[in-house]
């Protein structure tokens, strides 16, 4: 057929990759919510959800049915348009962040030359969603949680970006595939250990996960900026949080742990195993650490993480210049 051109085939393949990645990431985020509850039950010496299906295997289906039939309520004095847009922006920005992650040598939705910058841009866009949610709800707790979240996210995104500059300098590229190929013989976690530590801490903070979940602290703010949300709007925030965890875990693997590289097993399997390990670490951190005060979180970022990233960047630059001579 004359209308089937190589460009059309490439477009169709790109759409297919995007749809597959969308389904896989959303499914992983949904299953992680169930897995987290089961593992937290194990860590805390209790049962966890085990009533629906064999061993709780159908709990996720029950949660989805319940969420679909929840009343989609909008507060009377809220800004209805912005209130509705906020969860959509949050979910979309977190999902788009995964588009730049190379799952295997030939499987990446968007192989951008500005891949890391695109991720930082999407992470910044999520701040607007949180601010929209807090302001449009017309609720003091919601607004206070949104202000906490925006201040925390903007602060830790500085450390998040600086922690990646050493990796970019070593690879000589912002392209994620180039960064993975540069780790064929030595993972970046060895020369960039302090960069990895800072990225891991900042990644947890940007995802608003325990112990950096002050924006939605139940004891203080009654669930923070999404206190007024219900039904599918709340579901978008809820699943979006777990998609953020999947994305940050995948980025840790891609940037510091060799991506798909590994012996014997296929590339995709190695990538999936490494990503699952870091997703487990998110759950273990939640089960293990207490929640600090909000001022302690901000102080830790500016007084510990920022100097650590700057020292790591200066040492990396000095080593690269020394090797070039």
UniProtKB/Swiss-Prot annotation:
It comes from the Bacteria. It holds the Pfam family NADHdh. Signal peptide: none annotated. Its EC number is 7.1.1.-. Disulfide bonds: none annotated. NDH-1 is composed of 13 different subunits. Subunits NuoA, H, J, K, L, M, N constitute the membrane sector of the complex. Belongs to the complex I subunit 1 family. NDH-1 shuttles electrons from NADH, via FMN and iron-sulfur (Fe-S) centers, to quinones in the respiratory chain. The immediate electron acceptor for the enzyme in this species is believed to be ubiquinone. Couples the redox reaction to proton translocation (for every two electrons transferred, four hydrogen ions are translocated across the cytoplasmic membrane), and thus conserves the redox energy in a proton gradient. This subunit may bind ubiquinone. HAMAP family: NDH1_NuoH (MF_01350). This is NADH-quinone oxidoreductase subunit H. The lineage of its organism: Bacteria, Pseudomonadati, Pseudomonadota, Gammaproteobacteria, Enterobacterales.
């Amino acid at each position: 057929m004359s209308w089937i051109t190589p460009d059309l085939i490439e477009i169709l393949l790109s759409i297919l990759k995007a749809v597959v990645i969308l389904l896989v990431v959303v499914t992983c985020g949904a299953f992680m919510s169930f897995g987290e509850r089961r593992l937290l039950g194990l860590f805390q010496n209790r049962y966890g959800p085990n009533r629906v299906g064999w061993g709780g295997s159908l709990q996720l289906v029950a949660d989805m049915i319940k969420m679909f039939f929840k009343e989609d309520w909008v507060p009377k004095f809220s800004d209805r348009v912005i209130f509705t847009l906020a969860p959509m922006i949050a979910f979309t920005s977190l999902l788009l962040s995964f588009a730049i992650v190379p799952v295997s040598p030939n499987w990446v939705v968007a192989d951008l030359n500005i891949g890391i910058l695109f991720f930082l841009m999407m992470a910044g866009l999520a701040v607007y969603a949180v601010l929209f949610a807090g302001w449009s709800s017309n609720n003091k707790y919601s607004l206070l949680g949104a202000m906490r979240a925006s201040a925390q996210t903007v602060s830790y995104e500085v450390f998040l970006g600086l922690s990646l500059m050493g990796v970019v300098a070593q690879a000589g590229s912002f392209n994620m595939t180039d960064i993975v190929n540069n780790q064929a013989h030595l993972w970046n976690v060895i020369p960039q250990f302090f960069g990895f530590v800072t990225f891991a801490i900042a990644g947890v903070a940007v995802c608003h996960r325990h112990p950096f979940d002050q924006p939605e602290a139940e004891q203080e703010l009654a669930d923070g900026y999404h206190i007024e949300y219900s039904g599918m709007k709340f579901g978008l925030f809820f699943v979006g949080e777990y998609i953020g965890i999947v994305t940050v875990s995948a980025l840790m693997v891609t940037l510091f742990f060799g991506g798909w590289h590994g012996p014997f097993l296929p590339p995709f399997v190695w990538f999936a195993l490494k990503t699952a390990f870091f997703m487990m670490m998110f759950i273990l951190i939640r089960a293990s650490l207490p929640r600090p005060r909000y001022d302690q979180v901000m102080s830790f970022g500016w007084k510990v993480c920022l100097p650590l990233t700057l020292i790591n960047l200066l040492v990396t630059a000095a080593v690269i210049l020394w090797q070039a001579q």
